[in-house]
Amino acid sequence: MRHGDISSSNDCVGVAVVNYKMPRLHTKAEVLDNCRKIADMLVGMKRGLPGMDLVIFPEYSTHGIMYDAKEMYDTASAIPGEETEIFADACRRANVWGVFSLTGERHEEHPNKAPYNTLILMNNQGEIVQKYRKIMPWVPIEGWYPGDCTYVSEGPKGLKISLIICDDGNYPEIWRDCAMRGAELVVRCQGYMYPAKEQQIMVSKAMAFMNNCYVAVANAAGFDGVYSYFGHSAIIGFDGRTLGETGEEEMGIQYAELSKHLIRDARKNGQSQNHLFKLVHRGYTGTINSGDGDKGVAACPYNFYSQWVNDPEGTREMVESFTRTTVGTPECPIEGIPHEAPKHR
């Protein structure tokens, strides 16, 4: 794990993250024009960072947030499509991999169902290697149709990569799922705004440490007329320490070199903080001392997870018993979100 240079090597993957200024767009033509700006930025960045193997742009960087529902549906993209063609050309010209946001991707039943919030990982030949749909849209505000699966793909120089999006990262389950599928780098693209800056900086560092994985965060910056985005795009080591972090500046860039050997060595030889290994070898010191073998205990001890898998509806009812039974709340109603009738005291 190296930071401060502009290089890379056969072992180290050069990764850049961008504080892209949140655009405010309304038409397909404006979206495509913005795609060209992203493409030009990518090519320019490669001149300044010759070691750059992978560049990551934030959630909403392509389309911006369409606050008008008709505009959101009208500008929703097909994948592959015109937007990805522009990105593919840039990746080929710069010989760089890229992560790009498409908000939204047309649903299979478009326009009868809401679009997906989608990320793509594209290789340096302009081919889409991974397409990830946001599992946890930021309700109650975001109206995206939820995805249902994480992925791991071989990225530049063989580094194993998973993509997640913004609010996904507030749920430890998704990080663990990616890591247990073999991800060495979890890319978190976000369009996160104030007031949640401190929490979001903290959670990505904690999840890197807890899952023995690199984390690359690309966040939006600026003000789009509705929200103020805090930037702080960052690259985090698998020990939870920040290698590089931007401030709040629009179009700020950070860059670091991620060693494949170091993370693989740590996962193989780490002991007290090897969380992935220890989770399925629980208490092995105690079982050795007890004559019960040297593997520890593999069984999942967490009742909630087995209950959720085997009885999702029943588990939802259980959670509603100590939270609420409607998706909305009458004490802070949001248009279009059902809530129970207010109680008069």
Swiss-Prot record:
It is an enzyme of class 3 (hydrolase). Residues 13-260 form the CN hydrolase domain. SUPFAM superfamilies: Carbon-nitrogen hydrolase (SSF56317). One of its GO terms (molecular function) is amidase activity. The active site is at residues 59, 134, 166. Pfam families: CN_hydrolase. It catalyses: a monocarboxylic acid amide + H2O = a monocarboxylate + NH4(+). It comes from the Bacteria. Keywords: Hydrolase. Its EC number is 3.5.1.4. Belongs to the carbon-nitrogen hydrolase superfamily. Aliphatic amidase family. Catalyzes the hydrolysis of short-chain aliphatic amides to their corresponding organic acids with release of ammonia. This is Aliphatic amidase.
